[in-house]
Swiss-Prot record:
Residues 276-299 have a biased composition (Low complexity). The chain crosses the membrane at residues 8-28, 36-56, 67-87, 95-115, 124-144, 155-175, 180-200. GO terms for cellular component: Golgi apparatus; Golgi membrane; membrane; plasma membrane. GO terms for molecular function: sugar transmembrane transporter activity. This is Sugar transporter SWEET1. Keywords: Cell membrane, Golgi apparatus, Membrane, Repeat, Sugar transport, Transmembrane, Transmembrane helix, Transport. The gene is swt-1. Residues 247-261 have a biased composition (Basic and acidic residues).
Amino acid sequence: MLEVVLQVLSISAITTTIALFFCGIPICMQIRRQGAVGDISGVPFLMGVLGGSFWLRYGLLKMDYVMIIVNVVGVACMAFYCVFFLIYSLPKKTFTCQLILVTSTIGGMVLWIALKPNLDYLGVICMTFNIMNFGAPLAGLGVVLKNREVSTLPLPMCVANFLVSSQWCLYGNLVSDIYIIIPNGIGMFLAIVQLALFVVLPIRENEKSPLEKLASWFTGRDSKVKDLERGDCIVSSPPSSPQKVPNETRSDVEDKFDKLMAETSSTIPSDSRRGSMGSPPSYKSRSSSDPDLSSIQSP
């Protein structure tokens, strides 16, 4: 039964680890769109080549075919990513020096194991490099904390690190290899720290982090803001107190009346004013042709 579990876990670890190696493809595509590496760090690729080469030599020395298959694919992928990163890096001097240093270290290790093979010494070195490899994405942690966003931290690689390290930690327990258990246990912890950054920090600037979005959803604050943007929520203003009309005195009313009469009299012609108001009305005497109204009696 244990052999079946080990075989299934070996296939699963090989599959997920190779999938981890392909997580560098989105990073390379982002570099190509930008035309330069920008703030993206090439340390994960360098550590992938370095750690993969040491683990490959460890697997060959131990004759562990699971580790041999995984690390052959891993070294090939990471070497391709390093060449791609070198093409787009400006200036190239820094990354070139780092690449030469990594290559020299691998060459020294191969020569040392060929002259004096020691599985324990090599296991300790592999364990150290593996821990550094899991923490390699933290090299860009300074940029993440400075910008307060995690766009430069590769999420697929962090997730894959967590899955792979947990499987290899279980694999190390089954094969009783302390050099596999310790680094992958630490790798699980580092992966959890990296994933926690994606929860507390936003992906891009001027955006909310997933934790803030969850808090807004629980409190309902986000829905209130959307209602205000749509104009659904109308805030009623308190009723305004009626304006008080100032009290007018009797003299003010008389002044307004005199002014109104003066304006009215100015619009009437002088002849009309004189005929209508100055002289009494004239009456015409009755002529003989006019009818005598006195003869008309009332009924």
